[in-house]
């Protein structure tokens, strides 16, 4: 069973068990799970997740679970999003590249935490949804691209951090080349037997990286094709 079908099955099984109704409920849960960065918690408080989920799952917007979106993709579990962002140790002066915009929830969080966000989405439907969502929130520091994230931004920009929202067997070389020395990249790595683990890389120079393996996750695959 693929990830999307698993999510739908779990939602049907647990639809009566709703614990979080508002942003502050979700933020309280994130605190209990160890997310203590006040800037990240403030971003979660400000961004309405309900804007980014499908209408039929609106009542689950603030649950700490991933949810299906269009194009057989997902909006990630809030705790995993918060943890990944926390690992990057972002500053307000930073520029971040995001691979996999989806409907733009994580992008919006990043926009509150750094100077510029560059985000690439392969599906035109999601690309357009995200742009609309960000316009509604009046976020001015997000740069959108419709394309294959494996190819990077295709411009002479080096990033302080890169976050990949889909699983891959290895980090694409063009993304590694786009990272500044001292920068961090976080992504879910695919292993055998459908195992995935979150990986954090810190770039020392073009030939040296510090690698940290974190915990098991489940993400949709990183696609290598033309945008659709």
Identify the meaning behind each predicted range.
Residues 2-97, 105-109, 113, 126-140, ...:
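Class I SAM-dependent transferase core
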Residues 89-209:
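Conserved nucleotide-cofactor-binding alpha/beta core module
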Residues 206, 225-226:
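Short, solvent-exposed coil/turn segments at beta-strand boundaries
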């Amino acid at each position: 069973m693929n990830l999307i079908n698993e999510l739908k099955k779990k939602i049907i099984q647990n639809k009566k068990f709703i614990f979080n109704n508002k942003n502050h409920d979700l933020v309280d849960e994130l605190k209990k799970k160890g997310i203590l960065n006040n800037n990240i918690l403030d971003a979660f408080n400000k961004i309405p997740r309900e804007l980014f989920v499908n209408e039929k799952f609106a009542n689950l917007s603030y649950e700490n679970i991933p949810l299906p979106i269009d194009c057989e993709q997902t909006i990630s579990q809030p705790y995993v999003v918060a943890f990944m962002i926390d690992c990057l140790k972002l500053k307000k002066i930073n520029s971040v590249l995001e691979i996999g915009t989806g409907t733009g929830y994580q992008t919006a969080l990043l926009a509150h935490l750094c100077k510029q966000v560059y985000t690439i989405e392969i599906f035109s439907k999601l690309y357009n949804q995200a742009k609309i969502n960000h316009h509604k929130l009046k976020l001015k520091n997000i740069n959108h691209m419709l394309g294959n994230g494996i190819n990077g931004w295709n411009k002479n920009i080096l990033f302080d951090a890169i976050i990949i929202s889909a699983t891959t067997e290895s980090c694409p070389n063009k993304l590694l080349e786009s990272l500044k020395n001292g920068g961090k990249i976080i992504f879910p790595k695919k292993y055998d037997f459908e195992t995935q683990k979150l990986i954090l890389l810190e770039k020392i120079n073009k030939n040296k990286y510090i690698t940290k393996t974190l915990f098991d996750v489940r993400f949709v695959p990183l696609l290598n094709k033309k945008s659709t």
